[in-house]
């Protein structure tokens, strides 16, 4: 049989949520706990790292767009480094972590807008961050979903209505939850890791630092 079980869920898992995503995460947790009471359940916030689908996605948009559209610019997140989540999962799989639910967030809490500002600073680009109101975003998402249906799934939506619902709620560790401190893990801050993998989105890529140094050496007129 299975000696230990670790489930990766998500912060915000709640059967009473308006978001289907949050509902299904909670339902999955309940099913796991019913079948395997000794399971370790991890609820990370937005995960960042070399192959993440968050910062990489938005950084990629800056290559061809002067505007960076975001939904829920003031919604708060607590991004967590993928290696820290992996370490927590390893502790659960090896029996070091006691059974139960752990909410995993990084050391910093930022709004969506602030996260985009930090990302732009790392990739050395200036873009207008445009907040899209939830009502307009929901209407746009409906259109994207319609296109997906008409294309028989060949054209995926840029955003879904359920994602818009999720973005209405802060994605941060709750005050009473067990987390990294209970596991003895000190989470890594975003600014330590982001330059290591987002440099390729800089205007001159890996040569951006050389370009900046050269510009400082030019004689002033």
Question: What residues fall within each predicted segment?
Answer:
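Substrate-positioning beta->alpha
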Residues: 23, 53-54, 72-94, 100-103, ...
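A hydrophobic C-terminal alpha-helical subdomain
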Residues: 135-221
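Conserved Rossmann-fold NAD(P)-dependent oxidoreductase catalytic core, especially the SDR/UDP-sugar
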Residues: 1-35, 39-45
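Core catalytic loop region at the nicotinamide-binding pocket of NAD(P)H-dependent oxidoreductases
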Residues: 92-106, 125-130, 154-157, 178, ...
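Flexible, glycine-rich beta-alpha linker
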Residues: 17-20, 40-61, 76, 110-111
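Conserved sequence/active-site signature of Rossmann-fold short-chain dehydrogenase/reductase
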Residues: 13, 47-49, 85
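Substrate-binding strand-loop-helix patch
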Residues: 76-83, 102-122, 131-142, 186-188
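A short C-terminal helix-loop "cap" of Rossmann-like NAD(P)-dependent dehydrogenase/epimerase domains
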Residues: 59-72
């Amino acid at each position: 049989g299975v000696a230990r079980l670790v489930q990766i869920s998500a912060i915000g898992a709640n059967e009473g949520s308006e978001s289907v995503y949050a509902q299904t995460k909670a339902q999955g947790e309940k099913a796991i706990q019913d079948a395997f009471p000794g399971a370790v359940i991890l609820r990370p916030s937005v995960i960042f790292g070399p192959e993440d689908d968050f910062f990489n996605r938005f950084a990629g948009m800056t290559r061809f767009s002067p505007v960076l559209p975001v939904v829920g610019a003031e919604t708060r997140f607590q991004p967590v480094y993928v290696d820290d989540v992996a370490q927590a999962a390893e502790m659960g799989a090896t029996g070091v972590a006691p059974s139960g639910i752990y909410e995993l967030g990084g050391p910093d809490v930022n709004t969506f807008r602030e996260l985009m500002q930090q990302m732009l600073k790392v990739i050395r680009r200036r873009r207008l961050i445009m907040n899209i109101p939830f009502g307009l975003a929901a209407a746009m998402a409906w259109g994207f979903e319609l296109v997906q249906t008409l294309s028989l799934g060949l054209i995926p939506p840029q955003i879904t209505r359920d994602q818009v619902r999720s973005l209405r709620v802060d994605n941060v560790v709750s005050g009473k939850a067990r987390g990294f401190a209970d596991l003895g893990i000190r989470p890594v801050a975003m600014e330590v890791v982001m330059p290591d993998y987002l440099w390729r989105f800089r205007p001159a890529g890996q040569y951006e630092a050389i370009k900046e140094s050269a510009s400082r050496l030019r004689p002033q007129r």
